[in-house]
Amino acid sequence: MSDNANAIDPNETTATRRQRGERIAAELSGDPNPALLATLDRDFPFLANALTSYAVGEVLARTVLDVRARQLALVAAFAALGFGNEFKIHGGYALNAGVTEDELKEIVYLITIPAGFPRAIQASQALAELLASRRAA
């Protein structure tokens, strides 16, 4: 499959991508107005626009991978990079998309190979926080 099979129309406006990004963010989070985007929009509108129009409205809008696979890939990447906050955000999205707690724990185990134990321990702590907050809700 070529990269162009899933490409976003280059003539599409940033506003169109942002609208799509806002819709996808709401679907992923299960919240029609995700708090992260609202805070960014208020305090750092340029970041909110970049995140919503490009990262979500373009990259996450692609359909070569389904939502579940895409979120597993992102969770693994964020865990390996040591980005605990992003791991928790996308871990929540992954759970919303049908990924199980055991699958997220397996990601933590798997990243010991490319990223080492310190990053896996960071990810395990982030996952424990995520799961505790979801159970408390």
Where are these regions (language model features)?
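A cross-kingdom feature marking solvent-exposed beta-strand/loop segments within repeated
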Residues: 90-97, 102-109, 130
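Substrate/cofactor-recognition hotspot
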Residues: 71, 86, 110, 117-121
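Acidic, glycine/proline-rich low-complexity segments that act as flexible tails and inter-domain linkers
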Residues: 1-67, 96, 121-137
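A short structural micro-motif
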Residues: 79-80, 97, 110-117
